[in-house]
């Protein structure tokens, strides 16, 4: 079941998955219960993040899972975050504390390989007060997409065995107890 409270995004998802027989849509979650809830780069958009984690818990079956990703490191917070309507970035400690009523299955930074180039770029642009490009033409760049695919696949393999010491984002898998 796909739940998306934002109207434009909801319409987009309905169009994208209109021919899928396995995808259901819910405009209101109500008291529905799920075995898995994925919140990929969602929580940082919500002013009261503790409240949304409580809501996620209420919509999980007993022993259900939340897979969540958020941007990492407050020192990287920039105008781009504001443009994306982010309220915050997280440290591992803050994110762990947010899910303190859950069992932690996995908690790690990710987007580790690109951390230094991205962090340095953000910090330089903040220092010289240049804003990020506001609009990027929406054309796929196959070379970059292929490179990112390879890098993220490599990180996925590393994450099976190790937690990463830093990264642009954090991933957590939490189990309701």
Regions found by a protein language model. Give the residues of each.
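A C-terminal cap/extension of S-adenosyl-L-methionine-dependent methyltransferases
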Residues: 111-177
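Short secondary-structure junctions
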Residues: 103-106
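Acceptor-substrate binding/catalytic loop of class I
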Residues: 78-97, 108-111
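Short glycine/proline- and charge-enriched loop/turn segments
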Residues: 74-81, 130-133
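Short, hinge-like loop/turn segments at secondary-structure boundaries
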Residues: 17-21, 84-87, 122-126
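Short aromatic-enriched loop/helix-cap "lid" or pocket-rim segments at secondary-structure transitions
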Residues: 13, 78-82, 117-121
